[in-house]
A protein has these predicted regions:
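Glycine-rich ThDP/TPP pyrophosphate-binding loop and its adjacent helix/strand module
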Residues: 14-17, 23-168
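N-terminal core-entry segment
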Residues: 6-9
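Carboxylate/His-rich catalytic cores and anion/metal-binding grooves
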Residues: 1-4
């Protein structure tokens, strides 16, 4: 709601600066530095794959989960995100789907101050399935998510191009 957005980065709100497990509904792990949530998600994806290989059989698929993560320009600037993306591509974690909000803004200002590469091409080089969409178009996002769900042998990156504050 708009009331919650007005409480952005405030303690005990639904929109804290650093959401914490157990305090913010829907948050499955606490992160700290930028990029660490992305790395946590890749670890969860590997964990799900490992559990599936142990407990699934040809008759029963007990563990068949997808791990979804939201990332920002600030996340993608961090070294930990590059290392994780390379590792996830190498392991072919097809159950990892990343929605990247590419709005060219970080907390420090314009993302171009610290990053000039094409993130989608970087992820393609790491072996990821990469798609692009208008991040303000729900149908395009849904189509990209649907396609990502059909890719079993590569992690997926959806580069959702947005304009910060659009419609506010």
């Amino acid at each position: 709601s708009m009331d919650e957005l007005k409480n952005f980065r405030q303690w005990n709100s639904l929109t804290p600066g650093h959401p914490e497990y157990g305090l913010t509904p829907g948050v499955e792990c606490t992160t700290g530095p930028l990029g660490s949530g992305f790395s946590n998600a890749a670890g969860m994806a590997l964990g799900a794959k490992m559990m599936g290989s142990r407990f699934n059989s040809s008759d029963i698929s007990l563990i068949d989960s997808r791990i979804f993560v939201l990332c920002s320009d600030g996340d993608m600037q961090e070294g930990i995100a590059s290392e994780t993306a390379s590792w996830a591509g190498h392991l072919r974690l097809g159950n990892l789907i990343t929605l990247y909000d590419s709005n060219d803004i970080t907390i420090a200002g314009d993302a171009g101050l610290a990053m000039s590469e094409d993130v989608g091409k970087r992820f393609e080089a790491y072996g990821w399935h990469v798609q692009h969409c208008d991040g303000h178009n729900h149908d395009e996002i849904a189509d990209c998510l649907e396609e990502s769900l059909s890719v079993a042998n590569k992690p997926s990156l959806i580069v959702a191009k947005t304009v910060i504050g659009k419609g506010a």
